[in-house]
Amino acid sequence: MTTLETLKWDGKKSGKVSLDLAVAKETSSADLIHRAVLRQLANKRQGTASTLTRSEVRGGGRKPYKQKGTGRARQGSIRTPLRPGGGIIFGPKPRSYNLDMNRKERRLALRTALMSRVSDMKAVEDFGSTLKQPKTSDIINGLARLGIQKTEKVLVILDSPSDIIKKSINNIEKVKLIAADQLNVFDILNANKLVIGQSAIDKIQEVYAS
């Protein structure tokens, strides 16, 4: 179990909250998280790259020039891979890059990744509570009050973010907003800081407890 200090939106301390998630053994955690990240990135690939082989290139029914007497290397077709515009040897064809991973392993990897970032977490009691309308500068100033630098990549985790918060964060290049029940290993590890709403911590423990 880990205890986090909670902050208010104005940056003042307001109390403490506990985060208790089962994690993988230290001997296997790195491999588990590595496989989870590989799976996530591989499954994002479209796999639609396609090239033409020698048999698929248009033309080439006749010999481009006679066999002897030209001083050039002999050629039997303009579709040969040796010529510009010819077929491609062992080029990519449409395929699936999807990798499988058991649900139990995926959830364990996510819990382990999240708990490994405890030192970079900021628990906020009332994230964006003062916003009455979408305003990017209010979010930037609020993150600064929490001790987060403009150059840092930030993952904001909220239970059910409002449209005002979504629109306010949308234009900030290094800040990403995600719902507490839609976490993924890559985003957790890719961020420099994690800002978590207090209600989101309860949601995380409810959804990912086992």
UniProtKB/Swiss-Prot annotation:
Keyword annotations from UniProtKB, A to Z: Ribonucleoprotein, Ribosomal protein, RNA-binding, rRNA-binding
Region (Disordered): 46-85
Record SUPFAM superfamilies: Ribosomal protein L4
Recorded superkingdom: Bacteria
Coiled coil: none
One GO-annotated biological process of the protein: translation
Pfam families: Ribosomal_L4 (PF00573)
GO cellular component: ribonucleoprotein complex; ribosome
Composition-biased stretches (Basic residues): 60-71
Annotated GO MF terms: rRNA binding; structural constituent of ribosome
Keyword Iron listed: no
SUBUNIT field: Part of the 50S ribosomal subunit.
Family classification: Belongs to the universal ribosomal protein uL4 family.
UniProt-recorded name of the protein: Large ribosomal subunit protein uL4
